Amino acid sequence: MQEHFGSYAEYVTRSSFGQVMTVITNHEAQLGIIPCDNHEMNLKPWWSGFSSTGEGLKIIAKLPFLKRKENPLTESDVYVVALTHPAQSGDDVSLLGIEVNNDVSVSTIVEALENAGYRNPKIQLMAKVDDENKSYLAEVDGFLKPNDDGLKPLRAQFNNINIVGSYARPIEL
């Protein structure tokens, strides 16, 4: 992370998203870093604590921002979390937290997102909520503003759906 924030940036490690969230919401840190992969921190749906409207945590970036095609495995992708709304870049990806019953398939979610007009939906993470429900973190192309009209028809299909944040699409060199 030092190559993205500079060698003088101070950082501390936390073992759970709850700890990261507490440090940020208590203003002990300005940014949090959450792994994008199946890291043990992602066994619980941390994204369900994000609100589509109002103040609160949002994903504002994805790192690394510059990716080299010849060496794609240099570091793992991470989301940057902060107590601010993301800025629109013109080439963005938005993240949605979607909670459904266990019997709802990934293909059903992707199809519902496409039918609502969202482009290029991809499921990034899945975590069990309880014995009857699961939660997905999905990416769609474009910058979504709070209370995006496309979410209205989806609210009837899913137990819950909210905008978790947006980030500028990383550049491949």
Description of each model-found segment:
Residues M1-L173:
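Domain-level signature for soluble enzymes in the chorismate/prephenate branch of the shikimate pathway
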